[in-house]
Curated annotation (Swiss-Prot):
Family the UniProt entry places it in: Belongs to the NDRG family.
Pfam family, one: Ndr
Sequence segments annotated as region (Disordered): 301-352
Species this chain originates from: Rattus norvegicus (Rat)
Biased composition regions of type Low complexity, renumbered to the chain: 308-323
Protein's recorded name: Protein NDRG4
Length: 352
């Protein structure tokens, strides 16, 4: 991979071009951070608030960041021709190895929201050796049946596409109150994302199949995510039930479940600081950025109790050579707490 690929790229895949934006340059053998946005959004609408945060930039300067836009969802995308077949959710996942290979990434840490979380989970199931860890926000592991399909069709007859998408993105309370954030996203979804292309992506997401994962030991030959996973959802978010169910199907020794209060449907937009703090501890638990300075701690602030628990659940010794030289570390799943908590072998649910 060249010294720096910073900027926009169109990557050829078996299912068409994929728009990708690279920020930064490779850092030794460290994984790339790869993001995938939710339906109705693109990488800018979904992740700009989070990745523009100063504390997040303190983290991402240690990695190359790769933002992936689903086909036809990027700013200024041309409308697909009549009869274009939008890739299935599984096909979207199988497009990602082309991105990884194009830039020479050895493996990635994925951050996905909603539909993007589903795509990244599918990617990790099909290509487990390419995925080092996953942060999955608002993921729904369940497929959509005929009843769901009919309900979606009916909703489409009585609501505009942007309003239908908003009901997927935001909590009922946010929609009823018609918050400034909801108004802003209604306007941007209507004007920034090509509506015909969005309709195709929306239809495909609502035709998805079950992820078909099960917690190890619950069924013979259970298939589940093998990498460390941090699940994130806001209180009363539309995806809350789906994320809870996903949590029940993952390996509890490598899964952290973060339920965020007062964050609504888009925690990466409404609570980017808390999410960044959790992400930092998640990375440290995998053996990365051990010596990252917390800007707020130098001013006398202390981490929230919930984040301290998250750190204890995800972090072991952070002074290993792997944290310094960028070689691939082994996921850490035990505590370094002085309180004698011992090995953590259960899902850590944290509310903050």
């Amino acid at each position: 991979m060249p010294e720096c690929w910073d900027g926009e790229h169109d990557i050829e895949t078996p299912y068409g071009l994929l728009h990708v934006v690279i920020r930064g340059s490779p850092k030794g053998n460290r994984p790339a951070i790869l993001t995938y946005h939710d339906v109705g959004l693109n990488h800018k609408l979904c992740f700009n608030t989070l990745f523009n945060l100063e504390d997040m930039q303190e983290i991402t300067k240690h990695f190359v960041v790769c933002h992936v836009d689903a086909p036809g969802q990027q700013v200024g995308a041309s409308q697909f021709p009549q009869g274009y077949q939008f890739p299935s959710m599984e096909q979207l996942a199988t497009m990602l190895p082309n991105v990884v290979q194009h830039f020479g990434f050895k493996y990635v840490i994925g951050i996905g929201v909603g539909a993007g979380a589903y795509v990244l989970a599918k990617f990790a199931l099909i290509f487990p050796d390419l995925v080092e860890g996953l942060v999955l926000m608002n993921i729904d592991p369940n497929g959509k049946g005929w009843i769901d399909w009919a309900a979606t069709k009916l909703s489409g007859l009585t609501s505009t596409l942007p309003d239908t998408v908003l009901s997927h993105l935001f909590s009922q309370e946010e929609l009823v109150n018609n918050t400034e954030l909801v108004q802003s996203y209604r306007q941007q979804i209507s004007s920034v994302v090509n509506q015909a292309n969005l309709q195709l992506f929306w239809n495909m997401y609502n035709s998805r199949r079950d992820l078909d994962i099960n917690r190890p030991g619950t069924v013979p030959n259970a298939k589940t995510l093998r990498c460390p996973v941090m699940l994130v959802v806001g209180d009363n978010a539309p995806a809350e039930d789906g994320v809870v169910e996903c949590n029940s199907k993952l390996d509890p020794t490598t899964t952290t479940f973060l339920k965020m209060a007062d964050s609504g449907g888009l925690p990466q937009v409404t609570q980017p600081g808390k999410l960044t703090e959790a992400f930092k501890y998640f990375l440290q638990g995998m053996g990365y950025i051990a010596h990252l300075k917390d800007r707020r701690l130098s001013g006398g602030a202390v981490p929230s109790a919930s984040m301290t628990r998250l750190a204890r659940s995800r972090t072991a010794s952070l002074t290993s050579a792997s944290s310094v030289d960028g070689s691939r570390p082994q996921p850490c799943t035990h505590s370094d707490s002085s309180e004698g908590m011992g090995q953590v072998n259960h899902t850590m649910e944290v509310s903050c």
